[in-house]
Design a protein with these regions (language model features):
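A nucleotide- and high-energy phosphate-metabolite-utilizing enzyme signature
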Residues: 1-255
């Protein structure tokens, strides 16, 4: 099964490809040789693999213990094999059994607060992390995880239909996400590795690639960074508003 960013279908050139080999029972030894050969093949063709091997029961136990694992399973999908195995896992980790809505919401809010706290310094502002900084991709994903867990939302447009987002706000969210995706893709390509920080050494190259030209008023690099700051400010404000609305909705729920 595909998990994480691979499960969401959000890969960039040097993203890890996160997979799990899902077994019906805890009988890894029976398949150990086949599993090793399969993983060796993936490494031999130079894929950056993040992998785990778990049974249905182990998934339920690990997800109940660790919200990161629970989150990765929420957005998982079957790649090959018996799809009923993943369907069983999803039943085992549904919100009535582990990480009930309020618990999940509070845990994800706490994660976000701690993440923001690490990226509020001047250095992080000048060379921001596209994923982890406030208003970054992780904040967008957090909204997706919470809305999927509580409302069963399949995408952000569901939030428009549920009147959490205005159509214009939805467009702002998608525009901001696409901008961050574009910059992250460019970072991977020019650094020739997985890179999520918008380092000084890459900013000029990216500005040139994306057509931000110097003029009498400002440099191309300044134009790039101004757009970055505008987009993440908008995304952070949307994130704050949505979390507040979710908080009110979840507090009203009977679960």
């Amino acid at each position: 099964i595909a998990v994480g960013g691979y499960g969401r279908g959000e890969l960039h050139p040097y993203s890890d490809i996160d997979i799990q080999i899902l077994l019906a029972k805890n009988n890894k030894k029976k398949y150990q040789k086949d599993i090793e050969q399969f993983l060796t093949f993936l490494w031999d063709i130079n894929l950056e693999i993040g992998q785990s091997v778990r049974s249905i029961k182990e998934n339920q136990q690990e997800a109940a213990r660790d919200i990161t694992i629970a989150t990765s399973l929420i957005e998982s999908r079957t790649l090959a094999g018996n799809s009923e195995l993943l369907e069983t896992v999803m039943l085992q980790i549904e919100r009535k059994k582990i990480w009930k809505t309020k618990e999940f919401f509070e845990a994800k809010k706490s994660e976000q607060f701690q993440r923001h706290d690490k990226h509020e310094d001047v250095e992080s502002a000048l060379e921001p992390n596209l994923k982890e900084a406030p208003g970054g991709l992780r904040d967008i994903q957090n909204i997706g995880w919470i809305s999927k867990r509580h409302f069963g939302a399949s995408d952000f447009h569901d939030l428009v239909e549920r009147e959490f987002l205005e159509p214009g706000e939805y467009k702002d969210l998608i525009r901001g996400r696409n901008f961050l995706w574009k910059v992250r893709y460019g970072l991977h390509m020019i650094s020739d590795r997985r890179e999520d920080r918008l380092l000084f050494e890459h900013q000029r190259s990216l500005a040139e690639i994306f057509g931000y030209e110097d003029d009498a008023k400002s440099l191309g690099i300044e134009k790039l960074m101004k757009q970055y700051y505008r987009e993440v400010l908008s995304l952070r404000e949307l994130n704050d508003v949505l979390l507040q609305l979710f908080d009110e909705e979840i507090l009203r729920s009977r679960e």
